[in-house]
Amino acid sequence: MKISSLSILPLLGVVSAGIHGKKPNGPTYAGTNPGCTWYLDLVDDSYTCENIESQWDLSHEAFVAWNPGVKKDCSGLKVGLSVCVEAPMESITATPTSEASTSSETSSASPTASRPPLPSPTQDGLVSNCTKFHQAVSGDTCSKIISRYKPITLDQFIEWNPALEKDCSGLWSGYYYCVGIPGTPSAPLTSMPASTAHSGTNSNATVKPAAPGPTQDGIANNCQRWHKAVSGNTCASLLKQYGTFTLEEFIKWNPAVGEDCSGLWLNYYYCIGIPGTPTTKNSVPKPTTTACNTPGLPSPTQPGAICQCSKWHQVRQGETCDSITRNYRISISKFKEWNPNVGKDCYGLWLRYYVCVGGK
């Protein structure tokens, strides 16, 4: 009876004030669609997935996609929360997965830079290019948060977190809020005491240049040159662009990217030079097997590939050591013997470079 009585509420025009609106009146589920345009407040236990979907003419797939915490069996529906009942239909898509394979033997040559993962939970409307977050705790106020993350302003904080009102009401404990976007100055990067520039026995010691923006954990503490990752960047493309360091060096300076380079994040800064790193391409050898004088050698060849090779293959997008060896019916051990620089886990396979697939 509850379902049938609820379903006729819109016809009778007796929906209670404040039950639904453009903004939620209660907490939302973690992962709620950030593009949600209308919310329903679950004010009592009469609500079920079935009657909500019927009332708002929703498919179960859409309702669960917009409110992941509800769960497919509807066991997550709880009184006191607000659920999304209207959002752009194009947003009902599966979470994209990385092109890089989870298998160490099948890692692709060039995972591209991707956006950093979004913490959860967040309120709706959060800016999509946020690079720094703060989890609100009991007692937090906008003033306290702004003071902690100077030099951001109240206007910026509310612009990045539009679910907050101008008087900062709507700040929810346990939720994440944006406190930085690309280009936002970061006080911790410039707050190093001047005395550290002359500490120790080295009178010529200097403070290392601070990264001009967000960085990942573990970055080399003696980094002197930086690169901001943009769409389409891969580890291989950075090596080709600068030509002053090896893949092993880049991963050593930026360990968070991972050996398969799948952790390269858009708009983050990466170390591309430490003391002693050449500053021009001409300062280091080109990444080809220049020691070989074999006539008809293709170019460019995989660094370290054997000279006595009878057959070459140019690496294409999406190929892996495993797929190449299957195609040419050779063993993975023999392939790595002919192309030692691809590495143990094959992360050194370079896009559009030639690899040896047949020894003499």
From Swiss-Prot:
Domain annotation LysM: ranges: 37-85, 132-179, 225-272, 311-357
Swiss-Prot/TrEMBL keywords: Cell wall, Chitin-binding, Glycoprotein, Repeat, Secreted, Signal, Virulence
Region (Disordered): 94-125
Expression induction: Expression is induced during growth on Sabouraud medium containing glucose as carbon source, but not on keratin powder, nor on human nail fragments.
PROSITE patterns: LYSM (PS51782)
Listed Low complexity bias regions: 94-113
Glycosylation sites: N129, N204
Protein name, as recorded: Secreted LysM effector LysM2
Annotated organism of origin: Trichophyton rubrum (strain ATCC MYA-4607 / CBS 118892) (Athlete's foot fungus)
